[in-house]
Amino acid sequence: QRGSRGQRCGPGEVFNQCGSACPRVCGRPPAQACTLQCVSGCFCRRGYIRTQRGGCIPERQCHQR
């Protein structure tokens, strides 16, 4: 999927005009304090989680790493 500026999203990602500034990352605890601000860009699809390398994988694979 492409964003408004022609940005190409990777596998398991979707472009969102107003996504979280603090996405969940596999192997890291959730952010304790995250400001409620809109960030546009590529975000993991529902049921996926960001890896520490930057890609998105199914959440069920996160616990296997």
From Swiss-Prot:
Q: Which InterPro entries match?
A: Ser_inhib-like_sf (IPR036084), SerProtInhib-TIL_Domain (IPR051368), TIL_dom (IPR002919)
* Keywords, comma-separated and alphabetical: Antibiotic, Antimicrobial, Disulfide bond, Protease inhibitor, Pyrrolidone carboxylic acid, Secreted, Serine protease inhibitor
Q: Does the keyword Secreted apply?
A: yes
Modified positions (Pyrrolidone carboxylic acid) are Q1
Question: Which residues are listed as membrane-spanning?
Answer: none
Subcellular location per the Swiss-Prot or TrEMBL entry: Secreted
Q: Which GO biological process categories is it annotated with?
A: defense response to bacterium
Molecular function terms from GO: serine-type endopeptidase inhibitor activity
Q: Where is this site: Reactive bond?
A: L36, Q37
Task: Give every TIL domain span.
Answer: 9-62
What is a single Pfam family found in this protein's UniProt entry?
TIL
User: Which cysteines in this chain are paired by disulphide bridges?
Assistant: C9-C42, C18-C38, C22-C34, C26-C62, C44-C56
What this chain does, per the entry, is described as: Inhibits chymotrypsin and elastase. Has antibacterial activity against Gram-positive bacterium M.luteus and the Gram-negative bacterium E.coli.
Family to which the UniProt record says this protein belongs: Belongs to the serine protease inhibitor-like (TIL domain-containing) family.
Q: What is this protein called?
A: Chymotrypsin-elastase inhibitor ixodidin
UniProt organism field: Rhipicephalus microplus
